[in-house]
Amino acid sequence: LKLSEKAREAGAKVAVISSPHPVQLIKLLEHYNPEEASEIYLDAVDFCTTLVNEKVTVGLGELGRPHFEVDQKTWDLCNQVLKESLKMAKEVDASVILHTETGTPEVMADLASISNKANFPKSRLVKHYGGIGSIENSHGITVSLLASNENIAFASKNNFSHMLETDYLDDPKRPGAVLGPKTVPRKSLKSLQEGVISEEQFSKIHTDIPNFIYKEFI
């Protein structure tokens, strides 16, 4: 929130999201039983929905499940907690950013099923760190593609609806990871100039879809 204020001071409009990261649930399970760990995690989600209700933030993220292998009981618990989190997000009309394993058509179908069970609108559910596998058949979920040349060209050629991201970490130990903060505007403009994406696609990627997902940039 402090960083968003600095961005506004610099003239930017910002949409802020917050939530406990799904890996935090895994860490809680090291110290608590599944019921206790879930309750603590969902209490944090509830706090974040309060921020949305108070117009401090516009959505929840990153919610989801671990991107690494866990045992079946833990996996089932993570999916159950994700479903409950989506129900809570829907109550305050929040968008949700998902952190999950690598997206494939099968993964996207499973995430869409969880969203349906929570009665959460899939169009406002964003698969973060998306790639070709997640956008080939997104099952109605919005995909935020990592802004690589390959991803941009593939999505534009097939006219797939998407947003772009860098997953920039701002970690001094990993400078520029995953992609630098200037990557999206730089590659978007280059792709537009070279005819890789059309003006209509450019507008959808950077204006129409973000405005639909986040509703308000302050």
Model feature map: region roles:
Residues 1, 37-45, 74-84, 181-184:
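Charged helix-capping and loop-helix junction motifs
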Residues 2-52, 61:
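Metal-cofactor-binding active-site regions of metalloenzymes
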Residues 14-20, 58-63, 96-98, 124-128, ...:
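Hydrophobic faces of well-ordered beta-strands that scaffold small-molecule active sites
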Residues 20-24, 64-67, 102-104, 131-132, ...:
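Active-site-proximal loop/turn and secondary-structure-junction residues that shape catalytic pockets
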Residues 21-37, 56, 70, 169, ...:
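Active-site gating loops and adjacent loop-to-helix segments of metal-dependent hydrolytic enzymes
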Residues 31, 49-131:
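Divalent metal-binding pocket/active-site signature
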Residues 87, 185-218:
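Mid-to-C-terminal alpha-helical segments outside catalytic/metal-binding sites
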Residues 99, 160-178:
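Short acidic/histidine-rich active-site segments
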